[in-house]
């Protein structure tokens, strides 16, 4: 009997039934299919950056909205970064900037200060330093939810692209929203004027639009411009309303520095927030700030790079400036950091990084208030002016915030006008 059982087992092994062979084959094919799908997902996931926690600012969303030109600009930019990294392996202070393909582990090894120094190329200004923290957050404006947020006079959507072959800046004014919502006047039509600063050269005037609350300009202008002029020139977009007496009345203006857009490498497209032209005269200097957000670490980094042309309070001829950065949530101060004091310098170079822990879920409820102040003997400091940056700000404050969200993990630097308190 034992021999018969052994022979039966041996026969099953040598010549298994047909249905068992089918089961084994189906299982093997299923495993191969699962492995193939997994490998395909891993391969395709390397084609784009990690998904953003904010879908509206995901890279694929921008490519879909603005076309393949964004993808082409990105492909041009990556070899340029790689070339910079390869050509700067000498002194540590001249390390190349990280590309978007660098892993999070390599970023963590660098540390936030070295990473920001690489991206901004701040070697001429010295080593990037960490800011000081301030404990006191008590002030009258701590409970204000509208501090420094200027009333906007509508928005305009523009795009710009620089043709390096013909040295031409192509500007498109696409559409506008809420352009003539003003209580003190009534306008039935409007038009837009584009000027090149600082020469006040008019480069284009749009056709008159009758429906000024939601309109499509669809205007294109070409401006001959040398590459070196991109570092010095600005564009001013001015909207004029036409009243009952057919007079042209300025209803809003916005200025955009070409140096902050990196136009030779990539086009720019976005919404600009118009402001009252009279408020533009309240500027008491300019400040260069860099923002970046790392979603994996939930870390917002603000770099106070430098300021220029500061105007002191009370007609003083000299002062010792420093900068305070407040993190606001719904207008309330959540955190405060400040830079070191620079002695008697209207054009101070700070080059200090400030790191805030910010969960992604509350990022859209936050804003930054950057205050330039004068150091005093009693330690309080007199405020010179401020800048508001965030989703509820206006002008360049909103543009800078949106650009940061559109390029997560990479620093975005812009100049801001410091407005009088």
UniProtKB/Swiss-Prot annotation:
Stretches assigned to the C2 domain: 152-272, 283-416
PTM notes: Phosphorylation of Ser-97 is required for mossy-fiber long-term potentiation.
Keywords in alphabetical order: Cytoplasmic vesicle, Membrane, Phosphoprotein, Repeat, Synapse, Transmembrane, Transmembrane helix
SMART domains: C2 (SM00239)
Main location: membrane
Membrane-spanning segments: 19-39
Listed GO MF terms: calcium ion sensor activity; calcium-dependent phospholipid binding; SNARE binding
Phosphoserine modification, residue list: 97, 99, 214
Physiological role: Synaptic vesicle phosphoprotein that enhances spontaneous neurotransmitter release but does not effect induced neurotransmitter release. Unlike other synaptotagmins, it does not bind Ca(2+) or phospholipids. Essential for mossy-fiber long-term potentiation in the hippocampus.
Protein known as: Synaptotagmin-12
Organism in which the protein naturally occurs: Homo sapiens
Lineage of the organism: Eukaryota, Metazoa, Chordata, Craniata, Vertebrata
Gene: SYT12
